[in-house]
C-alpha cells in the first residue's frame, strides 16, 4: 500500500514536468519556425 501511495504522488509530478517541458519545446519551435507545416531540415 505504501508503494502505491508513493507511485500516486510521484506520477502526477513527473507527468506535469514532462508535459510542461514538452509544451515549452513546442512553443519554442513554433516561435523559431512560425507556421511551419513541414520543417526545412526534414524535407529531402
Curated annotation (Swiss-Prot):
* Gene3D superfamilies registered for this protein in UniProt: Single helix bin
Main location (coarse class): plastid
The transmembrane residues are: 7-27
| Entry keywords, A to Z | Chloroplast, Membrane, Photosynthesis, Photosystem I, Plastid, Thylakoid, Transmembrane, Transmembrane helix
Q: Detail the disulphide connectivity of this chain as listed in its UniProt entry.
A: none
What GO terms fall under cellular component here?
chloroplast thylakoid membrane; photosystem I; plastid
Protein's cellular compartments: Plastid, Chloroplast thylakoid membrane
Please indicate if the UniProt record lists Membrane as a keyword. yes
Q: How does it sit in the membrane?
A: Single-pass membrane protein
- Where on the tree of life does the source sit, at the highest rank? Eukaryota
**Gene Ontology biological process terms, A to Z:** photosynthesis
**Can the keyword Cell wall biogenesis/degradation be found in this entry's annotation?**
no
The record's function comment reads: May help in the organization of the PsaE and PsaF subunits.
**Entry similarity comment:** Belongs to the PsaJ family.
Recorded hits in HAMAP family, A to Z, give: PSI_PsaJ
Q: What is this protein called?
A: Photosystem I reaction center subunit IX
Which species does the entry assign this protein to?
A: Oryza sativa subsp. indica (Rice)
